[in-house]
């Protein structure tokens, strides 16, 4: 008989199996120490129920005012992250928590962020994460089963929804989803050197249908650094490295190699770096750039590549900002 699997619940994870005590107006959950930890409201949904009144234009203004305020605020960002998959979201969380003074804009082409991290692989639910990437699960509060050299999150969506919630709750992070990066801003400074200075954006539906309509010009976001984690080759995948290559700013891409889990995850993490001044590449996009192996349905490499990208960004940000302000 196989030994029982240890289930690890980080201290920041939510408890759902605690004893309850009902009062007249609330259901109160007791903590393991017996103290009252959370009071749930009573939902009175009888025939007298009604929502607070609202006018349709109020809803429209509530959305548009905030969105256009965000567009104005993040038109000059400190760091832009392209791609809100497991690597991109992890990078945004790491930078946002370690440097709350920085403005971080995330650009995601899909309506739904998360990339390929909503399922473990081939429509299966569980997510396998090789150690020591369980450290990040502990930090954000995702419970898992400890299997020795690896851990298993019961559903990949539990990780993705958690890292997304933790990241988007940060006051210095803004996600622009359903928004595609169509090009890069590349500037030659007074020192004669070229640098990435931001991204060119458009609504994804526009980007997908340029051939079916009259021209619609894009928008722009300036940034001192761009972190690209757009995944492997696809309609929007590996976009930034493909654009660097087509603009002859880097040599030709080497294309992703066949699957080798042990080799792939180590190489992705170790190889995450600034590939062109102002452009850091991580995640599966890096495998298209370097010609590294794919790793398949194991996600520790994506998480730690995101952290490595964030560490690289934080290590050079102040220098890049100073150089840009001096020469651009």
UniProtKB/Swiss-Prot annotation:
Gene Ontology biological-process annotations: thiamine biosynthetic process; thiazole biosynthetic process
Superkingdom as given in the UniProt entry: Eukaryota
One Pfam match: Thi4
EC number per UniProt: 2.4.2.60
Localization (cell): Cytoplasm; Nucleus
UniProt enzyme class: transferase
Keywords: Cytoplasm, Iron, Metal-binding, NAD, Nucleus, Thiamine biosynthesis, Transferase
Modified residues (2,3-didehydroalanine (Cys)): 215
Entry's induction text: Repressed by thiamine.
Requisite cofactors: Fe cation
Reaction equations catalysed: [ADP-thiazole synthase]-L-cysteine + glycine + NAD(+) = [ADP-thiazole synthase]-dehydroalanine + ADP-5-ethyl-4-methylthiazole-2-carboxylate + nicotinamide + 3 H2O + 2 H(+)
Posttranslational mods: During the catalytic reaction, a sulfide is transferred from Cys-215 to a reaction intermediate, generating a dehydroalanine residue.
Gene Ontology MF, one: iron ion binding
Binding site for substrate: 87, 108-109, 116, 181, 217, 232, 284, 294-296
Cofactor remark: Binds 1 Fe cation per subunit.
InterPro entries in alphabetical order: FAD/NAD-bd_sf (IPR036188), Sti35 (IPR027495), Thi4_fam (IPR002922)
Any one Gene Ontology cellular component term annotated for this protein: nucleus
PANTHER family: THIAMINE THIAZOLE SYNTHASE (PTHR43422:SF3)
NCBIfam families from the UniProt entry: sulfide-dependent adenosine diphosphate thiazole synthase
Description of how the protein assembles with itself and partners: Homooctamer.
Family: Belongs to the THI4 family.
Function: Involved in biosynthesis of the thiamine precursor thiazole. Catalyzes the conversion of NAD and glycine to adenosine diphosphate 5-(2-hydroxyethyl)-4-methylthiazole-2-carboxylic acid (ADT), an adenylated thiazole intermediate. The reaction includes an iron-dependent sulfide transfer from a conserved cysteine residue of the protein to a thiazole intermediate. The enzyme can only undergo a single turnover, which suggests it is a suicide enzyme. May have additional roles in adaptation to various stress conditions and in DNA damage tolerance.
The protein's name in its UniProt record: Thiamine thiazole synthase
Gene from which the chain derives: thi2
């Amino acid at each position: 008989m196989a030994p029982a699997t240890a289930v690890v619940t980080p201290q920041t994870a939510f408890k759902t199996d605690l004893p309850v005590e009902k009062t007249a107006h609330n259901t109160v959950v007791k903590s393991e120490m017996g103290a009252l930890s959370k009071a749930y409201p009573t939902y009175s949904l009888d025939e007298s129920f009604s929502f607070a009144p609202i006018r349709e234009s109020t809803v429209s203004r509530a959305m548009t005012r905030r969105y256009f305020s965000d567009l104005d605020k993040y038109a000059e960002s400190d760091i832009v992250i392209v791609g809100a998959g497991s690597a991109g979201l992890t990078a945004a969380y790491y930078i946002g928590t370690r440097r709350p003074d920085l403005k971080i804009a995330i650009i995601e082409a899909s309506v739904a962020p998360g990339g390929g991290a909503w399922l473990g692989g081939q429509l299966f639910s569980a997510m396998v994460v090789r150690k020591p990437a369980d450290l990040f699960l502990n930090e954000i509060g995702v419970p898992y089963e400890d299997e020795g050299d690896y851990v298993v999150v019961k559903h990949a969506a539990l990780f993705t929804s958690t890292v997304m919630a933790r990241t988007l709750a940060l006051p210095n992070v803004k996600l622009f989803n359903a928004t595609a990066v169509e090009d890069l801003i590349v500037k030659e400074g007074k020192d004669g050197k070229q640098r990435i200075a931001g991204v060119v954006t458009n609504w994804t539906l526009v980007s997908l249908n340029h051939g079916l309509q009259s021209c619609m010009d894009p928008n722009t976001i300036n940034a001192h650094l761009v972190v690209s984690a757009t995944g492997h080759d696809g309609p929007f995948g590996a976009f930034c490295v493909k654009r660097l290559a087509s603009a002859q700013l880097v040599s030709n891409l080497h294309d992703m190699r066949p699957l080798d889990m042990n080799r792939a995850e180590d190489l992705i993490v170790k190889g995450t770096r600034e590939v062109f001044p102002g452009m850091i590449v991580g995640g599966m996009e890096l495998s298209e750039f370097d010609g590294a192996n794919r790793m398949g349905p194991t996600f520790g490499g994506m998480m730690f590549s995101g952290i490595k990208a964030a560490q690289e960004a934080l290590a050079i940000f102040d220098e890049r900002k100073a150089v840009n302000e001096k020469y651009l």
